[in-house]
UniProtKB/Swiss-Prot annotation:
A Gene Ontology molecular function term of the record: protein homodimerization activity
Compartments in which it is found: Secreted
GO cellular component terms listed in the entry, alphabetical order: extracellular space
InterPro entries from the UniProt entry: Cystine-knot_cytokine, TGF-b_C, TGF-b_propeptide, TGF-beta-rel, TGFb_CS
Protein's recorded name: Growth/differentiation factor 8
Keywords recorded for this protein, A-Z: Cleavage on pair of basic residues, Cytokine, Disulfide bond, Glycoprotein, Growth factor, Secreted, Signal
Main location: secreted
Disulfide-bond pairs as recorded: 272-282, 281-340, 309-372, 313-374
Similarity section: Belongs to the TGF-beta family.
SUPFAM superfamilies for this protein: Cystine-knot cytokines
Length: 375
């Protein structure tokens, strides 16, 4: 009997030595396994984040139809960028894009009206080239996304050079038309009288909404405009073709369009932060910083919240995808299983320089992960 007790004691001692028990009752190997699991999850998320950033770079260039990032220095950008109030407001607005995808029970971006501001710069026109003499500006091409019944606001911005004394300036905006029998080539759009004080030049906006809507209804009538701004001595103060020291002072159109998309219900997914221990498929935050890439050619936004998906898709959580579960049950070896992937994405608005040093406005689709799921 005593020998049996000794054997039992030795057996228990060896078990403790091989598998020591912590004071709180948990085993050390279990704790290590949990730590290893968390480390593996962190490593996986870090790799996923890096892959997401590289994919974003490729997607942006591809969707903008650019073979490579435009090579434009910051000094050149300062010369080309219009120094106008509405553009600066737009840059400030998109400096850091907000992430509203988790607010409310409805899709904010699908339910509320969204307004876009489009900055259109003047381009060359065959009609202007064929005219005798040099017109005082300007021909504008318009994006197909601008529909006449969606235009909320259309402002022509012109820069007036400084004056040396209090001066009255007469501004006239003319629309070019096909020559009439009497030789008329212009029709008036707007005329106004301004009082200018000595000092720096000023930006002046003129409402051209009606004209723009007519152009959109009848594109063939868009032949361009002429801008005149004379002081009392006959000096033209309007900057139409910028001279030395007048970079960024070109005339341009600021157009605001609005639309109210179809209302839809939100299908919630999981949202996590970088310190989360959640193992299931989840959306994690990721801020893309274009300046960190050296992509100075992107005017706005400089940063935006892209987000990414990471996590496991276990079959026990797949009530939403019964067909996937049935396929796995029928052929478990041949099914790779569902992946954690974006189930809803939204676009970002972007102002950027293309390879020809032109300022372009565009909406890039599917750049923000709003929701993640298993599919």
């Amino acid at each position: 009997m005593q020998k049996l007790a000794v054997y039992v004691y030795i057996y228990l001692f060896m078990q403790i030595a091989v598998d020591p028990v912590a004071l709180d009752g948990s085993s050390q190997p279990t704790e290590n396994a949990e730590k290893d699991g968390l480390c593996n999850a962190c490593t996986w998320r870090q790799n996923t984040k890096s892959s997401r950033i590289e994919a974003i770079k490729i997607q942006i260039l591809s969707k903008l139809r650019l073979e490579q990032a435009p090579n434009i220095s910051r000094d050149v950008i300062k010369q080309l960028l219009p120094k106008a109030p509405p553009l600066q407001e737009l840059i400030d607005q998109y400096d850091v894009q907000r992430d509203d995808s988790s607010d409310g029970s409805l899709e904010d971006d699908d339910y509320h009206a969204t307004t876009e501001t489009i900055i259109t710069m003047p381009t060359e026109s065959d009609f202007l080239v064929q005219m005798e003499g040099k017109p005082k500006c300007c021909f504008f091409k318009f994006s197909s996304k601008i529909q006449y019944n969606k235009v909320v606001k259309a402002q022509l911005w012109i820069y007036l050079r400084q004056v040396q004394k209090p001066t009255t300036v007469f501004v006239q905006i003319l629309r070019l038309i096909k020559p009439m029998k009497d030789g008329t080539r212009y029709t008036g759009i707007r005329s106004l009288k301004l009082d200018m004080n000595p000092g720096t030049g000023i930006w002046q906006s003129i409402d051209v909404k009606t004209v723009l809507q007519n152009w959109l209804k009848q594109p063939e009538s868009n032949l361009g405009i002429e801008i005149k701004a004379f002081d009392e001595t006959g000096r033209d103060l309007a900057v139409t073709f910028p001279g030395p020291g007048e970079d960024g002072l070109n005339p341009f159109l600021e157009v605001r369009v609005t639309d109210t998309p179809k209302r839809s219900r939100r299908d919630f997914g999981l949202d996590c932060d970088e310190h989360s221990t959640e193992s299931r498929c989840c959306r994690y935050p990721l801020t893309v910083d274009f300046e960190a890439f050296g992509w100075d050619w992107i005017i706005a936004p400089k940063r935006y919240k892209a987000n990414y998906c990471s996590g496991e898709c276990e079959f026990v959580f797949l009530q939403k995808y019964p067909h996937t579960h049935l396929v796995h049950q029928a052929n478990p070896r041949g099914s790779a299983g569902p992946c954690c992937t974006p189930t809803k994405m939204s676009p970002i608005n972007m102002l950027y320089f293309n390879g020809k040093e032109q300022i372009i406005y565009g909406k890039i689709p599917a750049m923000v992960v709003d929701r993640c799921g298993c599919s």
